[in-house]
Amino acid sequence: MQAEELKYLPHEAVIKKVAPLATLDNVVSGIPAAITLAQFIIESFWGRSPLASASNNCFGMKKNLSGNNWPGSTWTGKSMTWVSSEASSGETVRQPSEFRVYASVEDSITDHSAYLAGAMNGTDLRYKGLRWQLDYRTAAQIIKDGGYATAPDYVEVLCAMIERYNLTQYNVAQPPFLVRVTVPMVAARKGPGSEHPATVVVRGPNVFTITEVQGSYGRLKSGAVAALQRVNPHAKQRADAQ
């Protein structure tokens, strides 16, 4: 998705398009979807800000952050100069900074969550305790204390946005376990059974996946979902999303 696609949509329509991305990211990264959505709305002004439109950077992510050493980043190294407002000594000043450029909104969300989950401050996580934190006020305070934003009322603004649009409904609770299947080869087919043609084949050491590719179906997915459902009847939706 390109941020430009959101430019003229009403607020509810923006949430409808972005919320599934935030929820899926929540499953993978552990960053609450409510926090992702609220920051998306505030930092990109509903995806309409000039920076978001020009770069798909929907969270104000600057070029250099915490040594750029967190795992899972989707940033390719491309950046652009943009003038932004920063709070300094009680005043708001405008100054040029280098901001990250992304290929899509999805990449922006993934990099933002990877940063929140893995950025370091010395030997400690900068946002320690944020992953799977379902108390949104606690989560917002962790983000503020970690130095994400300079605005003194950032926590209040973030929480107000979450409450106004009931964004906690998109959160995913921490799963009790992770299913990981390691195999030498995976073939996703158009239906269950080897008589159906394969749509994609992945080979190599330590290939692991529960996958659905363009409507395809694989034995690993089928078996893993069935096994997972026996111990957790509500797990199918999460497994299908992987």
Language model: regions and residue ranges:
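Hydrophobic residues in beta-strands and at strand termini
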Residues: 61, 181-182, 210, 220
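Core beta-strand residues in small-molecule sensory/regulatory alpha/beta domains
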Residues: 189-191
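Cell-envelope/ECM-targeting effectors and their regulatory/trafficking segments
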Residues: 173-177, 182, 222, 239-242
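SH3/SH3-like beta-barrel superfamily modules
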Residues: 199-236, 240
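Catalytic cores of secreted/periplasmic lytic hydrolases that degrade extracellular macromolecules
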Residues: 1-178
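The feature marks long, low-complexity, polar/acidic/proline-rich intrinsically disordered regions embedded
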Residues: 193-195
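Residue "hotspots" at secondary-structure boundaries inside conserved domains
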Residues: 100, 197-200
